[in-house]
């Protein structure tokens, strides 16, 4: 039912391996498409954050004074989640939830 929608292209055609659109609901399909666009835009902004830091350098000072984490510390992955105080993580999650609901 969605073979003629925007983004469907050869040679794959309509691609939904997990069956999110199996119910055939056009409203559900449009909501999923909008969600995919939002997530793509957030990912692009995150990538620009990495590029900006490489070009301009990182801020002086502490990201988390209580844990001794500076802005220029190189912390990646799960270790980054452990080092940041819970209030900071809640702030990130609330901000992302607000973006998702907008």
Swiss-Prot record:
**Record-linked Pfam families:** Chloroa_b-bind (PF00504)
| Localization (cell) | Plastid, Chloroplast thylakoid membrane
Question: What is the membrane topology noted in the UniProt record heading this document?
Answer: Multi-pass membrane protein
What does the UniProt record tell us about how this protein is modified after translation? Photoregulated by reversible phosphorylation of its threonine residues.
> What does the record's cofactor remark say about binding?
Binds at least 14 chlorophylls (8 Chl-a and 6 Chl-b) and carotenoids such as lutein and neoxanthin.
Q: Which GO terms describe its cellular component?
A: chloroplast thylakoid membrane; photosystem I; photosystem II
Primary site of residence? plastid
Q: Which Gene3D superfamilies match?
A: Chlorophyll a/b binding protein domain
Q: Report TM segments.
A: 78-98
Any one Gene Ontology MF annotation carried by this entry is: chlorophyll binding
| One GO BP annotation of this record | photosynthesis, light harvesting
Ordered alphabetically, the record's keywords are: Chlorophyll, Chloroplast, Chromophore, Magnesium, Membrane, Metal-binding, Phosphoprotein, Photosynthesis, Photosystem I, Photosystem II, Plastid, Thylakoid, Transmembrane, Transmembrane helix
UniProt-annotated binding residues for chlorophyll a 2: 39
Tell me which residues bind chlorophyll a 1.
36
PANTHER family per the UniProt record, alphabetical = CHLOROPHYLL A/B BINDING PROTEIN
Q: How does this chain assemble?
A: The LHC complex consists of chlorophyll a-b binding proteins.
The text the record gives for the protein's domains is: The N-terminus of the protein extends into the stroma where it is involved with adhesion of granal membranes and post-translational modifications; both are believed to mediate the distribution of excitation energy between photosystems I and II.
Quote the function comment for this protein. The light-harvesting complex (LHC) functions as a light receptor, it captures and delivers excitation energy to photosystems with which it is closely associated.
Q: Its family? A: Belongs to the light-harvesting chlorophyll a/b-binding (LHC) protein family.
Instruction: Specify the protein name.
Output: Caroteno-chlorophyll a-c-binding protein
